[in-house]
Amino acid sequence: MCGPTATTVANAGTGGETIKGLPPGLKKPPWLRQRAPSGERFDYLSESLTGLKLNTVCEEAMCPNVGECWNGDTGTATVMLLGDTCTRGCRFCAVNTSQTPPPPDENEPENTAHAIAEWGVGYIVLTSVDRDDIPDGGSEHFARTVRTLKTIKSSVLVEALTPDFQGDMNAVAHLARSGLDVFAHNVETVERLQKRVRDPRANYEQSLAVLRHAKASKEGLVTKTSIMLGLGEEDEEIKQCMRACKEAGVDIFTLGQYLQPTPQHLPVKEFVTPEKFDFWKAYGEEVIGFRYVASGPLVRSSYKAGEFFIESMLRKDALDRGET
């Protein structure tokens, strides 16, 4: 079990070898250190987003990969819809919270779509805060953004990283059928740790139901989910979570290291090694059968490293269906 002392976990790739997880309370291990974000492309995206009054999860959630993602040849960002204030208070998340956030910007879907079209990216991730104060949880706002973007630039591939819409399956289906290419919703952690990690209004079975219903709502839709490691989960619990997600029809599974954003958030129980993340990638693809697993200390559910593979996968699927 991962905990406040050094933990030894079996390396499934070789007989008898082990991988040691680092105990918490130490300096951040070298594989988690990133340079401060800067650069011409970074500045361009930052100014573009600010000028259009768009929010990104890259900034709001203090993502460690923002410098890398924003400084690529084309640069990519995960745009956060429906404002920057969430109606829930998960204990791992740095996004602002309030039970009465400001109303959504009605111009946001069009502004977002036009901005993305101008960036010239081939793959974009749209996400949002939870908006339990809106009857449909923001599903139509999300869907309108997707529809507008596809109208302006049909070639762009769109991933939507969604809330659970309070279990409203009509809202799930509405977004799933909006024209997006990947429907992502995160279970966040293993089943045992759900109540400790997530807001009480979220739960494991509801998240699995959302993923299952999205998959059933549109033929050919790719589904995706993610969990954080380093919160005290056990290996067998991770395997069980993978199996449950696969049974719910999930195609893509990602795993990354939990990092405590502020002292008020949950502490890190363990820094999981890169070698262990490599094991989970192999296990997920070769044993569980996911089409793709992104697994690494700095991998996040919307991290660009996986997008190159996913983009190729989606375009191949389209060719197989006879689409252009």
Curated annotation (Swiss-Prot):
Cellular component GO terms, alphabetical: chloroplast; mitochondrion
Ranges for region Disordered: 1-30
GO molecular function per UniProt: 4 iron, 4 sulfur cluster binding; lipoate synthase activity; metal ion binding
Compartments in which it is found: Plastid, Chloroplast
Biased composition (Low complexity): 1-12, 20-29
Cofactor details (free text): Binds 2 [4Fe-4S] clusters per subunit. One cluster is coordinated with 3 cysteines and an exchangeable S-adenosyl-L-methionine.
SUPFAM superfamilies linked: Radical SAM enzymes
Binding site for [4Fe-4S] cluster 2: C86, C90, C93
Needed co-factor(s): [4Fe-4S] cluster
Catalysis performed (reactions): [[Fe-S] cluster scaffold protein carrying a second [4Fe-4S](2+) cluster] + N(6)-octanoyl-L-lysyl-[protein] + 2 oxidized [2Fe-2S]-[ferredoxin] + 2 S-adenosyl-L-methionine + 4 H(+) = [[Fe-S] cluster scaffold protein] + N(6)-[(R)-dihydrolipoyl]-L-lysyl-[protein] + 4 Fe(3+) + 2 hydrogen sulfide + 2 5'-deoxyadenosine + 2 L-methionine + 2 reduced [2Fe-2S]-[ferredoxin]
Keyword Iron carried by entry: yes
CDD domains referenced in this protein's UniProt entry, alphabetically: Radical_SAM (cd01335)
UniProt keywords, alphabetically: 4Fe-4S, Chloroplast, Iron, Iron-sulfur, Metal-binding, Plastid, S-adenosyl-L-methionine, Transferase
Other observations noted: This protein may be expected to contain an N-terminal transit peptide but none has been predicted.
PANTHER family in UniProt: LIPOYL SYNTHASE, LIPOYL SYNTHASE, CHLOROPLASTIC
NCBIfam families to which the protein is assigned, alphabetical: lipA, PRK05481.1, PRK12928.1
Protein name: Lipoyl synthase, chloroplastic
Source species: Ostreococcus lucimarinus (strain CCE9901)
Upper taxonomic lineage: Eukaryota, Viridiplantae, Chlorophyta, Mamiellophyceae, Mamiellales
Gene name of the encoded protein: LIP1P
